[in-house]
């Protein structure tokens, strides 16, 4: 159990660090299209005016909830707007701490699964198992967005690469820290 907990903390830290490289540095700009400063300010004002009263949420624009909305969706342009009503600090320390805690919990769940199903497997086999599950899950959840919901391929491909590499780093750590078949009884 101590190795599982230590591996989860260190694996979560590895996952968080990879995520930070992708999303907390200028590298993250690869995921986004840029608009001119004047257009950005005008869009922000329009968001505040039209979405501010209804609050934080995800908005499909135009809304396909009516016949007229469905016709507008068919004509385009369309957007899925992830709207936050309040300002945020960049970097947001609260989000960084919350993200680290989430990463540790996710690696703990993966470690429990590995320990339950692959306790007698070698490090290489456990690592392969994590990579295969990470690839399958992130392919569906990340790249499923452009496939099913017509979201932008560039952003979600970048997200997929960051998620897959985060899980690869975390998987290597947790697979290493779980007791090896040769060391059973020494935990």
Located regions from the model:
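Individual transmembrane alpha-helix segments
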Residues: 60-103
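N-terminal signal-anchor transmembrane alpha helix
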Residues: 3-46
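Transmembrane alpha-helical segments of integral membrane proteins
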Residues: 138-149
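Transmembrane alpha-helical segments in integral membrane proteins
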Residues: 98-119
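Non-cytosolic membrane-interface motifs at loop->transmembrane helix junctions
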Residues: 151-162
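A juxtamembrane structural motif centered on a specific transmembrane helix
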Residues: 172-187
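Internal alpha-helical transmembrane segments of multi-pass membrane proteins
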Residues: 3-4, 116-135, 184-185
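Hydrophobic cores of alpha-helical transmembrane segments in multi-pass inner/ER membrane proteins
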Residues: 106, 166-176
């Amino acid at each position: 159990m101590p190795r599982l907990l230590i591996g989860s903390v260190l694996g979560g830290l590895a996952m968080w660090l990879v995520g930070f490289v992708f999303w907390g540095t200028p590298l993250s700009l690869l995921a986004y299209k840029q608009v001119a400063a004047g257009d950005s300010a005008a869009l922000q004002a329009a968001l505040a005016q039209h979405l501010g009263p209804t609050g934080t949420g995800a908005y499909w624009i135009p809304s396909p909830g009516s016949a007229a909305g469905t016709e507008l969706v068919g004509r385009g342009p369309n957007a899925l707007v992830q709207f936050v009503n309040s300002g945020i600090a960049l970097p947001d320390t609260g989000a960084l701490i919350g993200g680290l805690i989430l990463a540790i919990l996710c690696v703990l769940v993966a470690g429990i699964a590995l320990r339950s199903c692959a306790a007698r497997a070698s490090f290489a086999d456990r690592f392969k198992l994590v990579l295969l599950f990470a690839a399958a899950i992130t392919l569906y959840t990340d790249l499923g967005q452009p496939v099913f919901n017509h979201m932008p391929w560039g952003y979600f491909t970048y997200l997929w690469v960051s998620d897959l590499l985060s899980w690869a780093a975390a998987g290597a750590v947790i697979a290493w820290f779980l007791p090896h078949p040769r060391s059973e009884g020494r935990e």
